[in-house]
């Protein structure tokens, strides 16, 4: 391990202190419908105390929950999941955040994974039954509903991003990768690797839940659905020659060739075979820099500095790749990337006094942005740093 990436005991404590102190600044309560926000029944964590104050974002919350359960804030984490159950029951979808004008847009679904994090601590089976029922509704009423105007399931049982406005730009917002060169400004035309991995994980999580509930018929139905998705994804998205998963342009019946960290989601979802994983790990060098992983490979397409392209590295994608590597036994690679990202955060905290939404992983500065000023704070960064410190703590080999 490069000495520049070693986290000292003081650095460890400085990061923990900052994160623990910041939770209170971003804990929000918004119980009533008011102005642009609709009310939520439980307190929640917003991304920061800046432009995202009072917003509970969907995909942000998964990574935030990872940190909350590791800082003994289980009731807050459970309340955030309960807020999503409330949204699903009220609106028949989980919007990207708790604002009226976002009711036609969701985000990559992570609710079953949030439920698993909370249940692992509480063991509350009654609560899990209620929560998993909401995820089943979300899957059938939004992501797999062929009767919606904004149809997501479009080709061979696979889904795309598509919000109420049915525009490429709005679909890219639903992806959470706003903006990126991944979709070549035609997001509606693509079956994304990450979205379909998330839906595959819903199906396998629901299959396991029903198996544990002694309901084999329901379990088998979701398992069949998951296996069908896995076969379709392998057929359309896996490039045997390149050894990587790519988004699929179903309008032109063409597999993409643009490398992004979305291609590692099959490791996180445990969809890839071990032979595929071995080939995928060889591509880490395309993305790896001193501060961790860039969201995309450095190519001419991404020289516009779209915020989800090279040279930016986003904390959620670091975690997805690290967890995926751990799932398949690539512990040394996971450790190396984790140390790079922790070291980057430690250095930026020392220099700026804050952690940030995203980073330029080449220079080690807060990330490039063309949409809004890069935000400090930051809930998912803090949570993922906390998770990494716990996972690779001194007792575990940090």
Locations of the language-model features?
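Extended, well-ordered alpha-helical scaffold segments
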Residues: 11-18, 73-84, 125-144, 202, ...
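Peripheral, non-catalytic segments that deliver or gate enzyme domains
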Residues: 192-195, 306-330
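Aromatic/His-enriched, Gly/Pro-containing loop or helix-boundary segments
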Residues: 88-131
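Extended glycan-interaction surfaces of carbohydrate-active proteins
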Residues: 2-55, 79-98, 148-191, 228-313, ...
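TPR repeat positional signature
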Residues: 61, 108, 112-115, 196, ...
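Alpha-helical support elements that line or immediately flank enzyme active sites
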Residues: 56-87, 262-273, 318-331
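Heptad-repeat amphipathic alpha-helical coiled-coil interaction surface used
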Residues: 112, 119, 200, 206-207, ...
């Amino acid at each position: 391990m490069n000495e520049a990436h070693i986290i000292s005991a003081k650095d460890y404590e400085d990061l923990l202190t900052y994160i623990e102190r910041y939770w209170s600044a971003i804990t929000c309560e918004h119980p009533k419908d008011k102005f642009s926000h609709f009310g939520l029944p439980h307190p929640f964590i917003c991304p920061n105390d800046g432009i995202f104050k009072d917003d509970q974002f969907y995909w942000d919350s998964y990574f935030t929950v990872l940190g909350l359960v590791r800082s003994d804030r289980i009731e807050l984490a459970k309340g955030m999941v309960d807020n999503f159950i409330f949204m699903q029951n009220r609106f028949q979808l989980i919007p990207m955040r708790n604002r009226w004008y976002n009711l036609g847009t969701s985000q990559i679904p992570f609710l079953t994974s949030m439920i698993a994090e909370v249940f692992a601590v509480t063991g509350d089976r009654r609560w899990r039954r209620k929560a998993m029922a909401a995820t089943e509704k979300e899957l059938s009423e939004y992501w797999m509903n062929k009767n919606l105007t904004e149809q997501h399931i479009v080709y061979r049982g696979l889904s795309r991003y598509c919000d109420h406005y049915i525009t490429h730009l709005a679909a890219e917002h639903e992806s959470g990768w706003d903006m990126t060169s991944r979709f070549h400004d035609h997001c509606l035309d693509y079956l994304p690797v990450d979205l379909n991995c998330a839906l595959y994980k819903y199906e396998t999580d629901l299959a396991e839940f029903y198996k544990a509930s002694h309901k084999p018929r329901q379990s088998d139905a979701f398992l069949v659905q998951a296996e069908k998705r896995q076969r379709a994804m392998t057929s359309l998205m896996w490039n045997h020659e390149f050894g990587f998963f790519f988004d699929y342009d179903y309008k032109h019946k063409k597999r993409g060739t643009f490398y992004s960290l979305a291609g590692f989601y099959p490791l996180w979802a445990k969809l890839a075979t071990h032979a595929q994983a071995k080939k995928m790990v060889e591509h880490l060098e395309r993305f790896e820099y001193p501060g961790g992983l860039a969201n995309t490979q450095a190519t001419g397409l991404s020289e516009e500095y779209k915020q989800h392209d090279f040279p930016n590295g986003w904390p959620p994608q670091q975690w997805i790749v690290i967890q995926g590597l751990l799932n398949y036994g690539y512990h040394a690679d996971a450790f190396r990337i984790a140390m790079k990202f922790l070291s980057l955060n430690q250095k930026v905290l020392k220099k700026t006094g804050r952690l940030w939404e995203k980073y330029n992983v080449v220079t080690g500065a807060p990330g490039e942005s063309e949409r809004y000023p890069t935000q400090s704070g930051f809930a998912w960064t803090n949570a993922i740093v906390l998770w990494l410190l716990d996972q690779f703590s001194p007792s575990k080999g940090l």
